[in-house]
Amino acid sequence: MGRRGVTVWFTGLSGAGKTTLSCGVAQQLQALGLPVEVLDGDLVRQHLSKELGFSRADRDENVRRIGFVAEMLTRHGVIVLVSAISPYRATRQEVRQQIGNFIEVFVDAPLEVCEQRDVKGLYRKARAGLIRHFTGIDDPYEPPEYPEVVCKTAEQSISECIDLVMQSLRSHGYLQ
């Protein structure tokens, strides 16, 4: 029997640190010789969800597509690291149920901190009304109620957050 795969789903506002954290965890897992794939929400949107906008229905569909790919990889023993805002609790719960082996990581940073980190200028554009349906500004973000891991990236270092995720993978039996 092969190794058990798992999906680690990093959720949080734009600029909270999801991509940085998932890439850091990926490096640690690769150093252990483990099969790992990172599914970054921005890249998935560019390649698998180009036609989708940012309505609630389109965001939900994008998350479902990410979940579909993650589930296939997880089933084949891969550790899948998903980095996606995925703002709606019900849709995250839906993909959790679909995938089964699932660890939710809430990458928690205050809106003000996310705006300060905004290298793409998206928050500024959203506040100016140039981008509509922007999560945290004119569209809601529903924080997880019971995530397995909470990383407060305004207070904790990235290495501390990586350690929390690695500890969760160990405690749930996905790593030795």
From Swiss-Prot:
InterPro entries: APS_kinase (IPR002891), P-loop_NTPase (IPR027417), Sulf_AdTrans/APS_kinase (IPR050512). Its EC number is 2.7.1.25. The active site is at 86 (phosphoserine intermediate). It catalyses: adenosine 5'-phosphosulfate + ATP = 3'-phosphoadenylyl sulfate + ADP + H(+). One of its GO terms (biological process) is hydrogen sulfide biosynthetic process. ATP binds at residues 12-19. One of its GO terms (cellular component) is cytoplasm. It is an enzyme of class 2 (transferase). Pathway: Sulfur metabolism; hydrogen sulfide biosynthesis; sulfite from sulfate: step 2/3. Keywords: ATP-binding, Kinase, Nucleotide-binding, Phosphoprotein, Transferase. SUPFAM superfamilies: P-loop containing nucleoside triphosphate hydrolases. GO terms for molecular function: adenylylsulfate kinase activity; ATP binding; sulfate adenylyltransferase (ATP) activity. It comes from the Bacteria. The keyword NAD does not apply. NCBIfam families: apsK, PRK00889.1, PRK03846.1. Belongs to the APS kinase family. Catalyzes the synthesis of activated sulfate. This is Adenylyl-sulfate kinase. The gene is cysC.
